[in-house]
Amino acid sequence: MAKTTKVKGNKKKSDTSKVVSKVSRKRSHEDSESEVEDNEKVVEELDADFDEVAGLLGDDIEDPESKSQSKKEKQKAKDEAKLEQLTKPQVSNEVPDNDNDDDSSEDVLFENADFSEPTMKAIKEMGFTKMTKVQAKTIPPLLAGRDVLGAAKTGSGKTLAFLIPAIELLYSLKIKPRNGTAVIIITPTRELALQIFGVARELMQFHSQTCGIVIGGADRRQEATKLAKGVNLLVATPGRLLDHLKNTQFVFSNLKALVIDEADRILEIGFEDEMKQIIKVLPNENRQSMLFSATQTTKVEDLARISLRPGPLYINVVPEKDVSTADGLEQGYVVCDSDKRFLLLFSFLKRNVKKKIIVFLSSCNSVKFYSELLNYIDLPVLDLHGKQKQQKRTNTFFEFCNAKQGILVCTDVAARGLDIPAVDWIVQFDPPDDPRDYIHRVGRTARGTQGKGKSLMFLTPSELGFLRYLKAAKVPLNEYEFPANKIANIQSQLTKLIKTNYLLNQSAKDGYRAYLQAYASHGLKTVYQIDKLDLKKVSASFGLDQVPRVNLSIGGTKTKKQKRS
């Protein structure tokens, strides 16, 4: 078990902060000395001003009736159609249901399962005692050799649901390293692949079979060497897996099981062509397949048809009457103007430094700027986004996982599937594109059967129309009001800091431009209207006193969903 620690950074600023200070000091002696003094004064003033705010964001949160706002009629029909598509279940009639209203699975214990001795020993050592509903419903048919198409809420325990049968299959067939790869698990992101690999390694600790991982950004040559030696259970991201299938000499002709996890996410980020090529290359004779997806879309159904054998078992543990988010999750939103967004975020984080918090932003450059800024003013945070090198992403992910408290600022790269322990708050600083993205973000907290957590979403007055979409998606929300006198008034000090610090100034401009580009690419145009933004106020939230020029690709080829996330 990894030893739990606090997120590093309390005693020293981030690497970026060091660079900022170094570069600042390289200017002329007169300019650099005065600049360093100014920056130190600004940081002191930020803390002093904050300390004057008593009882900040404590128990004074009010819960009035939610507001409403009229929307443009021009795109109403288009957005209504999108709303229906986002919230309506789309399960093919060709996939049989298996009567999921039965709750008899609630008390199924692992100790009563008929698993091999090495697997049972590992499960006991990992501390698992009772199966979740998806595990109790999925494991028996998979052990019997059925193909399964599974739908489950995030945090439902589906990783064990497919790993245990896969490992039992390797054990029963007495697979050896020289037999090559017999199980392949495909997942959308590197972080999720690392997480699944970690669980697989623990489950296989008493087995003789081998497991491995191939992901983008890792050392390809080392991966190829391990594959050639024999990896029985392989966890992979689509692009890197296809690369090895085409260019690396390793044995996969004995493939007996294929698992596709987070299938909807794989397709959303643009791996549809790669998946079709992978399935075409992999042997399908006597191959058992399992496909898991949080949402069932037409594309997911198409992928299921080409990857699963005819007549798969459809398992859905999300009752139609249920809300779309976890029962132990308290959800709220706050309405504030663009220029007050960072002030409110800073105040909230400052009051909750003893908590474990994930803050979601819409772009890599916004994450980069706000993490640099917060670390510079001695509010230590970690950051995670798609432009980072893989080693940095891996180190950050595991550091935050092992921390008892801390703040992670990230893009949606951390929003799907990742099991980060004991997250207290999910803060959606930049709004999600649609209800599905919202649900996957808040799914990082209140995980498991007894999980508890809270979420807070920031909205400007012009974005209140998004609440209607969340209501249709069965997401219960309350409005939180934070009185103006309870928010730290540090705007002048923030502006001074950004103006006098060259690297922070450049980072702020990059973050501002990226925020607007992401905003312009939102799918719900009647909710997220770029022309409704007050650019002066938006730039103020980045500490800028002048509005930078931005070229927006509205309606062009640039899209929000990209492979790099």
UniProtKB/Swiss-Prot annotation:
Short sequence motif Bipartite nuclear localization signal: positions: 340-356
Cellular component, GO annotation: nuclear envelope; nucleolus; preribosome, large subunit precursor; small-subunit processome
Gene3D superfamilies documented for this protein: P-loop containing nucleotide triphosphate hydrolases
TM helices/strands, residue ranges: none
Main location: nucleus
Residue window of motif DEAD box: 261-264
Biased composition regions of type Acidic residues, renumbered to the chain: 96-106
Keyword Transferase: no
Biological role: ATP-dependent RNA helicase involved in 40S ribosomal subunit biogenesis. Required for the processing and cleavage of 35S pre-rRNA at sites A0, A1, and A2, leading to mature 18S rRNA.
Full protein name: ATP-dependent RNA helicase HAS1
Species name: Candida albicans (strain SC5314 / ATCC MYA-2876)
